[in-house]
Amino acid sequence: MQIWKTFQLIPPLVKYTNAPTVGEKTEDKAVGVSKGGRNTKIHTLVDGLGNPIAFLLSHGNDHDSKHAIPLLSQINISGSNILGDKAYGAKAIRDYVDSHNAAYTIPPRNDVNDPWPVDWHTYKERNLVECFFQKLKWFRRIFTRYDKLDASFLAFVYIAAIVILLK
């Protein structure tokens, strides 16, 4: 008499998901996904000398104008001139700056029906924030984003800013 043993392949009962690892928080990690992969935007406020004042992280595929007001609300902007590129030319941002007794130098987009005047000589000073971002990219940990949590990534952005200020 022969005994036949049969084996069945049973699919797993547990579905493998991107569950948080031990010690990892499930909070928003400010990581966006696009065709190029995962990415994070660092929004920065700098003073007239190019020194960083405030930082904010967002998903890489979020529009810049969504995070301008939370970034500007971190400091007192009364009596100052806010420089920004065309992405920050939304009416809500301009109204926020006006309501806090500040001026803005933001060029209008090409498709705006009622463009506002821009002092292009003052607008040239916006290169200070671009220079700061180039200095920030010297740090490998920032331009590769090895950190899983946005709190630790933002902490290293602050450390890098301190190192840049001390040079």
PLM feature spans:
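Short alpha-helical elements
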Residues: M1-K167
